[in-house]
């Protein structure tokens, strides 16, 4: 029996790396409560790279990061798209 293991980290980097140098928008990067409602901000900039992090100590979860205009953003639970 042949088992194909889904390598999520490879899929992420293979999808993102060809887009380095292009514009990317990350939705709802910052969420703040102003007392009445949540304020959300999107970030648009030039993609400089991507990283993944696997938490081997606790639950083995994987986090995904994009470097945009010199800042690194956690996009694990964020939508992003290339413009």
Predicted segments with their positions:
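Mixed-charge, Lys/Arg-rich low-complexity intrinsically disordered regions
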Residues: 1-33
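Basic/aromatic-rich interaction segments and small domains that mediate binding to polyanionic partners
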Residues: 8, 29-77
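Short hydrophobic/aromatic patches at helix-to-coil boundaries
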Residues: 79-83
